[in-house]
């Protein structure tokens, strides 16, 4: 179980959030307006930033989708996903291609280097890479950015299918994404804004 205990983050004298406490053992949506600190909170959970006060327990191995896609631009979609897997690409290729079809990426797009994909296609690659990575906790920062409504529905369905019973924190302020997922919503601004 992921535990946030009295987590505080401030930049200079200005607190971003204060005394945030939460336990997560299943998928949840972290909702707050832009600028509240959702990305900073996820960065703390990933170990990329330190909180000003408080502690985090039970994160374990993390897989993440950042706001920036962080793909290897010269590799194609399947190769970007297999980077996080043991063994050879051929071992997983068919299953990964099936997942890409499920979220609306055709065979032609799968052959392109990541640098030639659209923004929405890059998000799908980043999302599948996180889903395929061996992890204890999944952290997703606005994972549906650049996706059309149909693709968002498909991606949300795949997340619902794959993430049951695992700590998943999906940060967004997109109401359509929240509806598509149907996960419990944690309104961060009501919990930890001073």
Residue ranges with predicted function:
Residues 149-151:
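Helix N-cap at the start of a conserved alpha-helix in ABC-type nucleotide-binding domains
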Residues 113-117, 121:
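Conserved ABC ATPase signature
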Residues 75-87, 95:
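Q-loop/switch helix immediately C-terminal to the Walker
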Residues 138-142:
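Catalytic Walker B motif of ABC-type/P-loop ATPase nucleotide-binding domains
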Residues 93-109:
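Conserved ABC ATPase "signature" region
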Residues 127:
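Hydrophobic anchor residue at the start of the ABC signature
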Residues 46:
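Helix-to-loop junction immediately C-terminal to a conserved catalytic motif
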Residues 133:
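Conserved signature/switch motifs of ABC ATPase nucleotide-binding domains
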């Amino acid at each position: 179980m992921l535990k946030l205990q009295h987590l505080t983050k401030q930049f200079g004298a200005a607190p971003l959030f204060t005394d945030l406490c939460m336990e997560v053992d299943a998928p949840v949506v972290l909702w707050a307006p832009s600028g509240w600190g959702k990305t900073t909170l996820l960065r703390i959970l990933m170990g990329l930033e330190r909180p000003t006060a408080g502690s985090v327990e039970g994160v374990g191995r993390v897989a993440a989708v950042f706001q920036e896609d962080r793909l290897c631009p010269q590799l194609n979609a399947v190769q970007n996903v297999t980077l996080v897997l043991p063994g050879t690409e051929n071992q997983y290729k068919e299953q990964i291609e099936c997942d890409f079809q499920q979220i609306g990426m055709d065979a032609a797009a799968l052959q392109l280097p990541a640098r030639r994909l659209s923004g929405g296609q890059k998000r799908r690659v980043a999302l599948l890479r996180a889903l395929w990575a061996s992890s204890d906790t999944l952290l997703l920062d606005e994972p549906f950015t650049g996706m059309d409504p149909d693709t968002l529905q498909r991606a949300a369905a795949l997340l619902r299918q794959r993430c049951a019973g695992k700590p998943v924190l999906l940060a967004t302020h997109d109401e359509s994404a929240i509806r598509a997922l149907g996960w419990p919503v944690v309104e961060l601004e009501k919990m930890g804004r001073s």
